[in-house]
Amino acid sequence: MPKIRIRTSDKLFSQWIRIRDGRCLRCGSSVKFNNSGLPISHNASHFQGRGKENTRFNPDNVCTLCYGCHSYFTAHPAEHTLWQVERLGQKKVDEIVFWSNQYKKRDDKLEAMLWKQELTKLQDKRKV
């Protein structure tokens, strides 16, 4: 399977997710931040992978996991699904899976603009 290219919008969205959560949602370890307030640890983990454009930037589809928990769920996808059901509920998981299988045309510039704006809002909120 070809490697998914990481776009500017992915990087912005990843930062937004890790700031939003502030910790690994499985084990609770805290995200570390640099002097600019940007996250420098943990992963923004996609339940339905980045290759699924329709849910690639869906905040419900992505959560913060530390490297250990992310690796564990990558190796144990059935347990990842069960954990997501516990976290979000069966209805939300079913919605994410459904939408992940629908077609969506990409607009990289629009996604990057949106997530840059959302990231700035979230960073400003953290400073207060």
Question: What role is predicted for each listed range?
Answer:
Residues R5, S9, N54, Y72:
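Conserved aromatic-histidine-acidic binding/catalytic patches
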Residues L25-V62:
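Histidine-centered nuclease catalytic patch
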Residues S29-F33, V62-E86:
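Short Cys/His-centered divalent metal-binding micro-motifs
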Residues V85-V93:
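Glycine-centered helix-coil hinge/cap
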Residues V93-V128:
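Short flanking/linker segments adjacent to small metal-binding domains or redox-active Cys/His motifs
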Residues M1-R23, K105-R106:
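Short, charged surface segments at domain edges that flank catalytic/cofactor-binding sites
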